[in-house]
Regions:
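Membrane-proximal helix-loop-helix units in multi-pass membrane proteins
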Residues: 99-167
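Membrane-helix boundary connector in multi-pass membrane proteins
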Residues: 107, 157-168, 175-192
């Protein structure tokens, strides 16, 4: 298995321990800041001229958080760092979001909703470890990339053949962006995009994303 992983994507170069710590600390702070922003926007209305951004609804959805986690994972220096950075991001996000909720908003968070995000935070290092290989080469990279693109496709589109359409334009942008950040070369990216179509249809018609709590 290690041979397959190393063949898919190799760790390039080493970074110093202080720099690694700073990167993880930044991920933690970034997550905390995003959590605070998300809750602030949930409780406060933006000026009317910014309504078109729809930031409150956007950050209340799952897709942007998964997209940030994917970016942190694939652009980390190693799969281990990917897991650490993504975990730090989600821990920071949860702390920021729920501290703001309980201290400044004056009420306690919904427990089932909190548990969903706690579970995602716990499993995120293992998922990020695998996602790091999506920017590698070969069948494994294509497979991981196609699943990721398929997930964003499910967020972006209504995949009912009788009513195919974009569901939410910001998530359509994230779908396009996911293709961009996972791009390796034209041939490999084309394979990933093609394979993502049946994967997305499978996810949609089995309801798997809803079952695992991210749909």
């Amino acid at each position: 298995m290690l041979k397959i992983l190393n063949k898919t994507r190799k760790v390039s170069g080493k970074i110093s321990v202080p720099k690694q710590i700073m990167t993880t600390f930044f991920a933690l702070l970034f997550g905390g800041g995003m959590g605070i922003v998300a809750k602030f926007l949930d409780l406060n209305r933006l000026p009317s001229f910014l309504d078109w951004l729809d930031l409150s609804n956007f950050l209340g959805r799952t897709a942007p958080w998964i997209f940030i986690a994917v970016c942190l994972a694939v652009f980390s220096k190693s799969p281990l760092k990917a897991g650490i950075n993504v975990f730090a991001f989600f821990v920071g996000m949860l702390i920021g979001y729920y501290v703001w909720t309980s201290v400044f908003a004056g009420f306690y968070p919904d427990i089932p909703y909190l548990m969903r995000w706690l579970i995602l935070a716990v499993v995120s290092p293992f998922l990020a470890f695998l996602i790091w290989y999506a920017r590698g080469r070969g069948a494994l990279a294509i497979g991981i990339s196609s699943v990721l693109i398929a997930i964003f496709c499910c967020f972006a589109f209504n995949l009912n053949f009788a009513d195919f359409r974009i569901l939410y334009f910001p998530e359509f942008i994230l779908w396009l962006a996911s293709i961009g950040i996972l791009f390796k070369d034209v041939k490999q990216s084309a394979f990933s995009l093609l394979i993502s179509i049946p994967v997305a249809l499978s996810l949609e018609y089995t309801g798997l994303l809803t079952i695992i709590g991210i749909g």
